[in-house]
Design a protein with these regions (language model features):
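DNA major-groove recognition helix of helix-turn-helix/homeodomain DNA-binding modules
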Residues: 56, 60-77
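Residue-level detection of the helix-turn-helix DNA-binding "recognition helix"
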Residues: 24, 38-39, 54, 83
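Alpha-helical residues within the helix-turn-helix
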Residues: 24, 35, 69
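Short alpha-helical DNA-recognition segment
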Residues: 27-51
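A short, Lys/Arg-rich alpha-helix, primarily the initiator
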Residues: 1-26, 76
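Short intrinsically disordered terminal tails
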Residues: 1, 84-85
Length: 85
């Protein structure tokens, strides 16, 4: 049986958009954030981060926590939208 990809819901879409907005507002590249996540113990490539931002890859809770720490915001801020950070 072929694996089905899981649909990304509204919260995932909002988090993806918020990650991209906060990253670009801070003038940080995807490689920088991915490297910070890796340094924090959550291996991530810039391609993985790009796919998360484009909502082509699901962002699991461990990804979310590492990305939030790399962006110096709370994980909740990523779920609430760019105005919450």
């Amino acid at each position: 049986m072929a694996a089905r990809s899981l649909e990304i819901g509204p919260a995932g879409m909002l988090a993806a958009r918020t990650i991209e907005i906060l990253r670009t507002e801070r003038g940080l590249g995807q490689r920088h954030i991915a490297a910070r996540c890796t340094a924090l113990g959550r291996p991530m490539s810039n391609t993985m981060l790009s796919r998360i931002e484009l909502a082509k890859r699901r962002c699991d809770i461990d990804d979310l926590v590492a990305i939030a720490e790399a962006l110096q915001v709370s994980p909740a801020a990523l779920l609430q939208g760019p105005g919450a950070a």
